A protein has these predicted regions:
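Catalytic center-proximal scaffold of phosphoryl-transfer enzymes
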Residues: 1-173
Length: 173
């Protein structure tokens, strides 16, 4: 019999006190889509344990130095920083010259599906509207679609999920 009490049913959540979060950055020049399993071209990895703001700054400094040594930065228009929106990842857009943060597709899809899964027959239509707004870079339209989903959502728990998805997508625009 499991011991499940404290504020709610489920696993007892303990604070993480002795965890280390390694950081991983990889640079590539494109994607080879010839095979079923796509391959990143001219791949270079940076990684390790970089603790705190100073550690993250050190990591991005290493990445920036590699970019400057390997590429003619006068011809670079943008350096896309692709990730899940974690603060340390977004900070790459500040530390890397011409850096621009872009939410990765996996997390974007994950949150759009969370926001629309309860819509049954209308889920595909709602997803299409959100994706269309993203492709067209129409943040206001995406917000309007999320607001409409919130209006037609009955369950309070599901409304919280939709709101969290809306905040995540629009917050990482």
């Amino acid at each position: 019999v499991s011991l499940q009490y404290i504020n709610e049913k489920g696993d007892i959540k303990k604070p993480r006190t002795n965890t280390i979060m390694p950081r991983l950055v990889y640079i590539y020049e494109g994607v080879d889509r010839e095979n079923k399993r796509h391959e990143l071209l001219t791949l270079k990895h940076f990684g390790g344990v970089y603790e705190g703001a100073k550690g993250v700054e050190t990591l991005w400094k290493e990445v920036g130095e590699y970019i400057e040594e390997s590429y003619d930065t006068d011809y670079l228009e943008k350096v896309y920083i692709n990730g899940d929106g974690a603060g340390w990842i977004k900070s790459g857009a500040v530390h890397i010259e011409k850096g621009k943060f872009v939410l990765d597709r996996f997390h974007m899809h994950k949150y759009i599906i969370k926001a629309t899964s309860h819509l049954m027959d209308s889920a595909d239509d709602a997803r299409s509207e959100i994706y269309r707004a993203i492709r067209r870079k129409e943040k206001h339209t995406a917000e309007t679609v999320f607001n409409h989903i919130l209006e037609i959502t009955d369950s309070e728990a599901k409304r919280k999920t939709v709101q969290a998805s809306k905040d995540y997508i629009l917050g990482n625009w």
